[in-house]
């Protein structure tokens, strides 16, 4: 049930998770992180655009009225940027409401027998590590809090248990065949060309880790205005167009290359941006994937040298690279400098 998966998503306190397990990372609520550049001519990141921010807000059940964004509890959160910056992905009361709704749907469809709901979390290994057990315990604690917060009939309990696969090959075979309830994965690539991400990672049956989602995507409709005309097609076909599909056999029903009269590489960036944002939203709203965090690399810096930029530009430029590094001290000068501070530069770094 998508409602049950949605309840799981709102149950997870992502800040608590990354503080414990991924301290250099950040809360992630989208399918593309901050590194994806939608316009290489200007270096503009997809995640920084209004369209991409609206996608995440809508996936989190926010809505806009007269320029002000409101959360699911009808509480004003301010402008688009203010509302976006306030997102955490965690909402205990909303998760409880969704869990109650999922329970009613499960009972109505005859798929709940009154017993505890146990979700199998699958991974590779010969045993459950201390870190993995801590992760399972944390998530189970969050799920227990949601069940306790329900004031209407709901599931007896919801929890995770671990199932181990002995090797990577067996694990990935089972994943692609849909033989597991839950897995934890990360993927990406082509940061300067994000258009094919939705199709290749989430829809294409040959490559996707979402078992059977290609057929689901064919039933999700998206309408986008192109040159003053509304064009309706499935998520599958819009994602295929972004993947540069041109022949009929690459589409399900609507050959958007012919309908639009333009390939993705020739289309205006603003239009491609709108298509990507709408596809990401449609995929997020299936709750087949529950984004948790954006993974980042953290490095220590030294007062011995300066990068070309104090700020990370993008994944192609970084902080300017080796050619733009300049040294403030030679090795000998640096050694003397450190010794002059008795080996403790805390006050120096704090002041700077």
List the predicted regions and their residue ranges.
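Charged helix-capping and loop-helix junction motifs
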Residues: 285-289, 301
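Extended, charge-rich low-complexity interaction segments
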Residues: 185-204
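Short, solvent-exposed loop/beta-turn-alpha elements that line the ligand-binding surface or hinge
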Residues: 37-93, 112, 173-174, 199-258, ...
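Generic hydrophobic alpha-helical scaffold/packing signal
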Residues: 9, 96, 136, 140, ...
């Amino acid at each position: 049930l998508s409602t049950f998966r949605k309840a799981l998503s709102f149950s997870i306190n992502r800040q608590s998770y990354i503080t414990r397990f991924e301290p250099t990372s950040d809360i992630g609520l989208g399918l593309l992180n901050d590194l994806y550049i939608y316009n290489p001519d200007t270096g503009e990141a997809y995640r920084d655009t209004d369209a991409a921010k609206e996608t995440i807000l809508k996936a989190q059940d926010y809505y806009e009225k007269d320029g002000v964004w409101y959360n699911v509890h009808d509480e004003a959160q301010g402008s688009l940027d203010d509302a976006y910056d306030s997102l955490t992905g965690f909402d205990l009361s909303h998760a409880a409401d969704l869990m109650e709704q999922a329970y009613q749907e499960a009972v109505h469809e005859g798929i709940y027998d009154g017993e505890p709901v146990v979700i199998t979390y699958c991974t590779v290994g010969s045993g459950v590590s201390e870190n993995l057990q801590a992760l399972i315990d944390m998530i189970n604690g969050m799920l227990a809090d949601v069940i306790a917060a329900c004031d209407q009939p709901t599931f007896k309990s919801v929890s995770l248990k671990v199932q181990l696969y002995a090797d990577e090959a067996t694990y990935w075979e089972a994943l692609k065949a849909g033989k597991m309830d839950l897995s934890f994965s990360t993927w990406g690539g082509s940061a300067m060309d994000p258009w094919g991400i939705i199709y290749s990672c989430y829809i294409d049956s040959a490559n996707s880790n979402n078992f059977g989602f290609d057929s689901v995507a064919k039933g999700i409709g998206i309408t986008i205005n192109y040159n003053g005309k509304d064009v309706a097609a499935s998520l599958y076909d819009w994602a295929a167009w972004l993947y540069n599909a041109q022949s009929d056999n690459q589409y399900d029903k609507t050959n958007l290359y012919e309908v639009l009269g333009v390939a993705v590489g020739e289309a205006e960036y603003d239009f491609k941006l709108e298509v990507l944002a709408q596809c990401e939203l449609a995929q997020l709203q299936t709750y087949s994937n529950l984004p948790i965090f954006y993974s980042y690399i953290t490095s220590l810096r030294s007062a011995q040298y300066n990068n070309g930029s104090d700020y990370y530009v993008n994944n192609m430029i970084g902080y300017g690279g080796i050619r733009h590094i300049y040294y403030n001290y030679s090795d000998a000068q640096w050694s003397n400098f450190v010794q002059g501070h008795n080996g403790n530069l805390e006050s120096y770094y704090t002041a700077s």
